[in-house]
Amino acid sequence: MIIRSDENIALQPEIDRRRTFAIISHPDAGKTTLTEKFLLYGGAIQMAGQVRAKGEARRTRSDFMQMEKDRGISVSASAMSFEYDNYWFNLVDTPGHSDFSEDTYRTLTAVDAAVMVIDGAKGVESQTQKLFEVCRMRDMPILTFCNKMDRESRDTFDIIDEIQENLAIDVTPASWPIGVGREFMGCYDMLNDRLELMDRADRNVVAKSIKISGLDDPKLAELVPENLLEKFLEEIEMAQELMPKFDHQSFMDGTMTPIWFG
């Protein structure tokens, strides 16, 4: 029998607003760089570092050991915290290399959810699949981020199909890329009906976040080149018709993952 004291009751609102999640991926998919972006946009840091920083360039916060700095990889799990939208997030950056995977396996027993990072050019890689299976054993909710869309990447539908087939999980798009490779100019936020357009001079920065009124909004034609817009609208129409809608319970059960691109 659990007796709830007045102190426990007083702490409950603070407990309810806390979220702990890990970031998992195959080596070099961009996991630690994404960690820096979470910290940056969460207000925990003022400038994002680089995994392979040279000279006086700022390095990433999670790769703080000398070995990590020298090799440009994560060799141990690192926990960081930030507050965003009245929630307190505990973020754990985990090692991707199989040599250090035991630390990752232990970490995954202590988190609420995981963000799975996929390289847009390589798709589902071996270590990603192993870490996914660890999450699956715990029926853990998984969010997917397909990274490096500004490089030569595979077809968006092919990436989604591979995730569904290799990992046996339903995938529902939460965003959709506008162009790929050199033509990549940002994403359409399908959940909030917004265009997230990148700065052409610095692809790491969102230059514009524009609210639109559906896919027939005239602003689309003003902001997106005609050749990209036509293909984008065709893909969005297919995605909405063919792919499952987001179901919160399926996500919480670990049988469906929403996917973002960037």
Residue ranges and their predicted role:
Residues 2-118, 124, 173, 215-217:
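P-loop NTPase switch module centered on the Walker A-proximal segment
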Residues 1-29, 120-262:
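P-loop NTPase catalytic nucleotide-binding module
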